[in-house]
Amino acid sequence: MSYSDVSPAEVKQRLRQEALSRRADLSHVFRIEASLSLADHVDQLRLADGCIVAGFWPIRDEIDPRPLLDALRKKGHRLCLPVVAEPHLIFRELTRETEFVSAGFGTQAPSPDAAELRPDVLLMPLAAFDCSGNRIGYGKGHYDMAISALEQSGPLDCVGLAYCVQEMSDVPAEPHDKPMDGILTEMGFRRF
């Protein structure tokens, strides 16, 4: 069966499963080295001084952005993490003093006491991506909705974080899908 015989949602589900399987097959040592390499590529992002960067706390076998977030903090950027809220994600400040609470999805988020920030740069987890900046998330649409809301108040640079093995030749984009502006993998940064 060709992909032309199925809906974009079905194609995405198949690609998501394939990419997550590839990611799961990576060795523990490779995952650690890849996560550390993100920080080595921090200057390739070419971020404006003092911008606010939204990261994420990794779940399952996602590439770990914490070394990159530490490198960004050392360069003077303010950091924040997503919190699932209605109608879309909000972002709370991440500092060394931040207290965390359980945030669902097996992750932690800053407590409600942390300041809510509007990021200039959004670092996003993903299941799969292609060379045009299309991404497949985990199917809930949290980041697509957050991007739509954030873009109402100004420019937003959306950067996916992933392992190279998560790249697919072509990811279908539906009208509600928000493309990335760039991707950062263990091999470096690419702008779309």
Regions found by a protein language model. Name each.
Residues 87-93, 134-136, 158:
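Short, well-ordered strand-loop elements centered on a beta-strand within folded domains, enriched
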Residues 64, 87, 142-143, 167:
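Short phosphate-engaging motifs
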Residues 58-61, 127-131:
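Short glycine-rich anion-binding loops that position phosphate/pyrophosphate groups of nucleotides
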Residues 2-117:
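N-terminal active-site beta-alpha-beta segment that forms phosphate/nucleotide-binding
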Residues 1-10, 14, 21-24, 113, ...:
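Surface-exposed, charge/polar-rich loops and edge strands
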Residues 109-110, 125-128:
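A structured binding-face within diverse protein domains that lines the active/interaction site
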Residues 139:
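Short polar/charged helix/loop
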